[in-house]
Amino acid sequence: MGMRMMFTMFLLVVLAITVVSFTSDHASDGRNTAANDKASKLMALRNECCDNPPCKSSNPDLCDWRS
């Protein structure tokens, strides 16, 4: 194989790796968004419950026991 052929193969490998990395990154964005939404909802629920004394006493695992 000549130098041009080796260089061309190198560029093709780099391009293939870039395309695979780029598409897999976009696929994970949806999972990250779903996880962030779930965490936000749980934090809102925790804040609502912990401000309400009856809910706080019913859910000690949800609220900080030291506060």
UniProtKB/Swiss-Prot annotation:
Tissue: Expressed by the venom duct.
Keyword terms of this UniProt record: Acetylcholine receptor inhibiting toxin, Disulfide bond, Ion channel impairing toxin, Neurotoxin, Postsynaptic neurotoxin, Secreted, Signal, Toxin
Chain intervals for the UniProt region annotation (Lacks the Ser-Xaa-Pro motif that is crucial for potent interaction with nAChR): 51-53
GO cellular component: extracellular region; host cell postsynaptic membrane
One Pfam family here: Toxin_8
Molecular function GO labels: acetylcholine receptor inhibitor activity; ion channel regulator activity; toxin activity
UniProt cross-references to InterPro entries, sorted A to Z: Conotoxin_a-typ
Signal peptide location: 1-21
Transmembrane segments: none
Propeptide: 22-46
Cystine pairs: C49-C55, C50-C63
Top-level lineage group: Eukaryota
Family: Belongs to the conotoxin A superfamily.
The protein's role, per its UniProt record: Alpha-conotoxins act on postsynaptic membranes, they bind to the nicotinic acetylcholine receptors (nAChR) and thus inhibit them. Has possibly a distinct nAChR binding mode from other alpha-conotoxins, due to a different three residue motif (lacks the Ser-Xaa-Pro motif).
Name of protein: Alpha-conotoxin-like Qc1.1b
The species this protein was found in: Conus quercinus
